[in-house]
Every structure is written in structure tokens, then in C-alpha cells.
């Protein structure tokens, strides 16, 4: 049946070198389960969406079974393990990329044709309902002060590490109220043990609504950094990972920036505080910058250019149309 969820991707998601190693048995078991399920379903084509560590293994197997393969949201081989291009050329028949620089990367550097379809976040944000700031504050028991949104991530180990440092600066910003954006899959009781200040509030499943009425945000690196920018909120990007994973990554990942905002713009539009730089002192200084008119004006100008570079809306529809056309032609 179309649209049937066999297993949620959250059950399969492990990030970081150490985390993958310690969960290797579970990962291999899920790969075997996926192959059996695909064989039973017997699809005409196979469409992969993101999640390269898992999907590229399945893509290799699928090609051996002579199943046409389409990949939406490319593996980030421009960041690390560029040699994966060999597997992509071999196992992926059609690639649909969502970042503007990816098209040049694939076609100019590796002579592999891809389709740039725009970024699906543009649709997600455009389709959301407008939120009235006063109503949002009233419904969530907030006062009239400007909001600083805290986005500590989506996984427990990540949240625990990021919230500790984010909340350390609350007492120095009494003129603002801090609101944590809870991950939908994690209940309030997990967050509660970190909240000791009266000036800290919590909402769950309302991240876009929260950002749309926020004055500034502290955001854990990842897709949330781009979401925050597209909702026009000045931000500080934060990251502090497992010590082993971080130092391994530092040696093999060749990027000037970790946030999608800066990568797309190819300049430091938003400040990134990474690992040892993510301290209370630095976080306070950067948040103070976000409250100044001149700094905010420059950020907003760059956000306009960012949106233009991402192309128009309709990324998923364009991808679906391209896949359908390929199916009809073959």
C-alpha cells in the first residue's frame, strides 16, 4: 500500500563515528530487514531520501537486483569521503540535489549529471500558518519580553550537552525570555532536569511557530540552522560533540563552515561556535551582537540573498515529476 510506514527513520539514525560503531549490530540488522522488505514489495523503482550511510548500502544491493534507483537529497560527499562518488556513479541512476553548489560539484568536478530542484524547506516554511506573537505568548504562558529561542537538537545525547551551555547564559539576559524548542519524539520530563532558571520556558512541536516570533536564536548545527535563517531569525550556531567523534571528523572533513547558511553563502553570515569555542563567555558575546541594529541589518540582507540562491518552491514536486518522467520514458 502506498505510503505505508514499515519502520521510522528515527529508529535507524545514529550520528557520529563512535555512535555508529557502538550500534553497528543494530544497523546491520536493519539493512537486512530493509532488503527483505523491498524484495517482498518488488518495486518498479526505488527512491532514496537522504540518510546516505544506510541508503547507499541498499542502493548497491538494489542495482544488483536491477531495480532503477533515484536519490533525492544527495549524500554530502562534498564535505567528506568524496571517494563515494564512485559508488554514486555506479549505483544511483538519477540524483536530485537541493543545495545550489552541489550541481557544480557533481557536474564540473565529477562529470556526473544531477538535477538541482531547490530546497524543500522553502515549501515547509511557505505552507505554515502565520502566527500572531501576542497570541503565541499568551497560549504558552509567556510575558511581553522578546524571545530568545533555544534549539538544542533532536537526540538526547546532543540535547543534554547543548542545553547545559545554552542555559548557562540565561541569568545575564533578564531583558529577554528563553524558550526551548522541544523535539517531538522527546517528552518534557527529559528537558525538565536541565531547567533550573525561572526565565526558561518550553514548547514542543512548535519550532516554526516559536522561531517566527523570536528575536534571536541559539541553534545546534544541522538543518535547523537553515530553518532559522529562512524564518528570518538572527542566530548563533552551536556545536559540541563527542570528543572522539569530533577529532576524527576534524581530520577528514574539509569544510570552511559547518552551518548550511554559511556553506550556501560561502561566507560567515552567522557565527559558528564549535567545540572548544562554545563557551559561556563567547556565547554571551555573540548573543549580545545579535541584539544590535547594525548587526541585525547585515544578517537580514544576507538572508534575502540566501533565499534567492536556494531557488523557488516546489522541490519535492519537481523531483516527483522528474522521477515520473523517467519511469514513463523507460
Language-model region placement:
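Nucleotide-activated sugar donor-binding and catalytic core shared by glycosyltransferases
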Residues: 1-330
